[in-house]
A protein has these predicted regions:
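Bacterial N-terminal signal peptides
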Residues: 2-15
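Exported/periplasmic ABC-transporter solute-binding proteins
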Residues: 19-64, 71-74, 78-84, 92-95, ...
Length: 261
């Protein structure tokens, strides 16, 4: 009888945990990976909100009920930590910029800068400050300036900030916004995360992915924090993301490891 009572008690506790919800605010580039992480996390149901990290940070700072924040940079979660809204920030994943090119663009690692500077070519980026991907693109422009003076002004002036803003277009279900914008020829080349470029090419195998040359390369460190006052399951979700299982899921989606666990 005691064994049966213990089993029933355990089942009740498991059901209670399953009914708990944890609100995760995360960078849009993490959607596929963290949806899979959430499905593997058994201690609570994860209610995920995805978007540009800078815009999510603003919403959290204004009091929205996020419990875990996974950002595409370290600065946004650190600003919440500094303001007393969140706990310590942990580096949990890394990404980098790639160039995603329309099928008819003759672009490679050697001529990438020349092609981006071509006045006839449309260069797409995300929105700086609102979305770290845009900040990383501007960092690439600064590196281009050191290689070829005048490049920063030319690139920053011509760059089309097509995603990552409050009014940016959204892709329909089953499509990526980058694949959609290239198909509509809103851009000829798009500077985006390598993970996002891989997802877009799954949608259209004719799209080209160009590695950014070393002199222009920009890496992205992703930061994770738990918001003050969150449920205990929120910290356990963060630990699960940092665990071997969570890191393996992120790696499957093209991310490289953050802090070792």
């Amino acid at each position: 009888m005691r064994a049966l009572a213990g089993l029933i008690c355990g089942l009740v506790l498991m059901q209670a945990h399953a009914q708990e919800q944890v609100r995760l605010y995360a960078a849009g580039s993490l959607r596929a990976a963290l949806d899979e992480v959430a499905a593997a996390f058994t201690e609570a149901k994860v209610q995920a909100v995805y978007g540009a990290s800078g815009l999510l940070r603003e919403r959290i700072a204004k009091g929205e009920a996020a419990e875990v924040f996974a950002s595409a940079n370290m600065d946004h979660p650190r600003s919440l930590e500094k303001a007393g809204r969140a706990g310590p920030v942990r580096l949990f994943a890394r990404n980098r910029l790639c160039a995603l090119a329309a099928p008819d663009m003759r672009v490679n690692e050697e001529n990438l800068l020349d092609r981006m500077l071509d006045p006839a070519l449309k260069l797409g980026t995300s929105t700086p400050k609102a979305d770290p991907s845009g900040d990383y693109a501007w960092e690439l422009f600064e590196k281009a300036e050191r290689l070829r003076p005048g490049s920063f002004q030319r690139l920053s002036q011509k760059a089309l900030q097509l995603v990552g803003g409050p009014d940016s277009p959204q892709a329909p279900p089953g499509r990526t916004v980058y694949g959609m914008l290239l198909a509509e020829r809103k851009a000829d080349i798009f500077l985006t995360y390598c993970t996002a470029a891989l997802q877009a090419r799954q949608e259209n195998a004719a799209l080209g992915i160009v590695e950014v040359p070393t002199a222009l390369a920009v890496g992205a460190d992703y930061g994770l924090t738990v918001i003050k006052g969150a449920k205990p399951q929120a910290e356990r979700l963060a630990q699960f993301i940092l665990s071997r299982e969570g890191q393996d899921i992120l790696a499957k989606h093209g991310f490289t490891p953050g802090e070792p666990q």
